Design a protein with these regions (language model features):
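S-adenosyl-L-methionine-dependent DNA methyltransferase catalytic core
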Residues: 17, 21-208
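Conserved S-adenosyl-L-methionine
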Residues: 1-12
């Protein structure tokens, strides 16, 4: 196989999130594919555009961690409630409305905090606190907000009993838009090969 690899940041592919990942793309050597990774876009999408319309009708998970099962006015618009670890509180976890999100991780307890809250106050190295008097504004992003940031469409519904499973499914996914641009580049690279043309012609014959 001819192997191509490159680190890509999802924020360069119309994903409202800082998310750096290394992608490996392999092609059979006999295809002689000269693959080029997509270049991306200069414009970044801020949180205000991604989740600005989801500020209301959000629910806290039952008992802090269980799904509200059919009672969310907006599907999956529920967030994990509960304490924050010392590791979580070691740095700021809030991005402003005009910024892209932190990386959406697979763990519910590591979900970024909602941009309605002010950035966390620096106390000393590896220690931050919520701004006094504004504590009520700090909450984790909801499952739906994380899905939006991962660019899943709103009609893609996640099913789970424990809300941690919802965060895990979303956090482990490749952002939808980034996957699209990668897949498009792969398709365009393959379209010139005889193998791909032969497959397309056979598929076309089935429809005639």
């Amino acid at each position: 196989y001819d192997l191509h690899f490159k680190m890509l940041n999802a924020k360069n592919f119309k994903v409202p999130q800082d998310r750096k990942r290394v992608f490996f793309i392999g092609f059979r050597k006999d295809l002689k594919i000269d693959f080029k990774f997509p270049e991306g876009f200069k414009e970044e999408i801020p949180l205000s555009k991604a989740i600005g319309d989801l500020t209301e009708k959000v629910l806290s998970a039952k008992n802090g961690k269980n799904a509200n099962n059919g009672h969310c006015p907006i599907p999956n618009h529920e967030y994990m409630d509960g304490g924050y670890s010392s590791i979580f509180m070691s740095r700021n976890r809030v991005r402003s409305w005009d910024e892209t999100s932190f990386t959406i991780q697979a763990g519910a307890r590591h979900a970024p905090l909602h941009p309605q809250a002010p950035k966390m106050k620096f106390i000393e190295q590896n220690k931050r606190e919520f701004v006094q008097g504004k504590e009520h504004l700090y909450r984790r992003l909801s499952v739906r907000e994380c899905a939006r940031i991962q660019t899943f469409p709103d009609d893609f519904i996640f099913h789970y009993d424990n809300i941690s499973a919802g965060y895990k499914m979303i956090g482990n996914a490749v952002p939808v838009r980034l996957a699209y641009y990668l897949a498009k580049e792969i398709k365009d690279s393959l379209s010139g090969s005889f193998l791909f043309q032969d497959i397309e012609s056979k598929q076309l014959e089935k429809t005639v």
